[in-house]
């Protein structure tokens, strides 16, 4: 499994310990920075990690900042990213099993290295239950979240290009209201 990791200056002191846990579990780790405690903008590192996942160059990601909040907000702006701040091993385990969390967000300043290791281990070892019989509700809920994200992106188009938005909305309404039959002829010689 390939995991991209990123942090800001507040998460930098915790990053080495988290990387060690990831590697101990057999993960190939790509460290996207930052590389010291000089002040940086956390959205840059959230973007770098999330782009790797969205583009298929990483399977999952880890983000670390002081509280985790800013990184989680930035990460969840990306379609297909399910980032969660996990502050206990149980929340990390449930985040994976119920929500298929693909980006673990850690509050580097709020936990000692041992706790961060336990949280990371629980997230790594957890699996998504959505395909298991009787637990399909988890996959259904993720699809609902993805649909809401697509609607949100479509709404944004309404503000940025109302003419295109109106044309697409009219087409969707027409498709919903009618059955379109496509005729084709096949000839056999």
Residue ranges and their predicted role:
Residues 1-24, 29:
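Glycine-rich phosphate/diphosphate-binding loop of Rossmann-like nucleotide-binding domains
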Residues 2-6, 10-13, 88-151:
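C-terminal binding/interaction regions
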Residues 2-3, 59-63, 82-84, 101-105, ...:
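Structural motif
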Residues 25, 78-79, 99:
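Short, structured coil segments at secondary-structure junctions
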Residues 28-39:
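A short beta-strand-loop structural module common to alpha/beta enzyme folds
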Residues 45-85:
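Helix-adjacent hinge/juxtasegments
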Residues 53-57, 96-98, 172-174:
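Solvent-exposed alpha-helices and their adjacent loops that cap or buttress functional pockets
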Residues 152-189:
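N-terminal glycine-rich, Lys/His-bearing helix-loop that initiates the first secondary-structure elements
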């Amino acid at each position: 499994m390939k995991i991209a990791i990123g942090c800001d200056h507040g998460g930098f002191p915790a990053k080495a310990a988290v990387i060690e846990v990831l590697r101990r579990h057999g993960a190939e780790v790509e460290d996207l920075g930052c590389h010291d405690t000089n002040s940086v903008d956390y959205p840059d590192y959230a973007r770098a990690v999330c782009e790797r996942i969205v583009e298929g160059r990483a399977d999952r990601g880890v983000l670390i900042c002081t509280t985790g909040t800013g990184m989680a907000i930035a990460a969840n702006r990306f379609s297909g990213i399910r980032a969660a701040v996990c502050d206990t091993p149980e929340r990390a385990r449930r985040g994976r099993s119920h929500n298929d969390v693909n980006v673990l967000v850690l509050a580097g300043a709020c936990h000692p290295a041992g706790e961060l290791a336990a949280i990371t281990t629980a997230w790594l070892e957890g699996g998504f239950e959505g395909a298991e019989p009787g637990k399909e509700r988890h996959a259904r809920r993720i699809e609902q979240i993805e649909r809401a994200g697509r609607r949100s992106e479509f709404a944004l188009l309404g503000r940025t290009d109302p003419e295109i938005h109106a044309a697409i909305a009219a087409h969707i309404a027409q498709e919903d209201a009618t059955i379109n039959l496509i005729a084709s002829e096949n000839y056999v010689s």
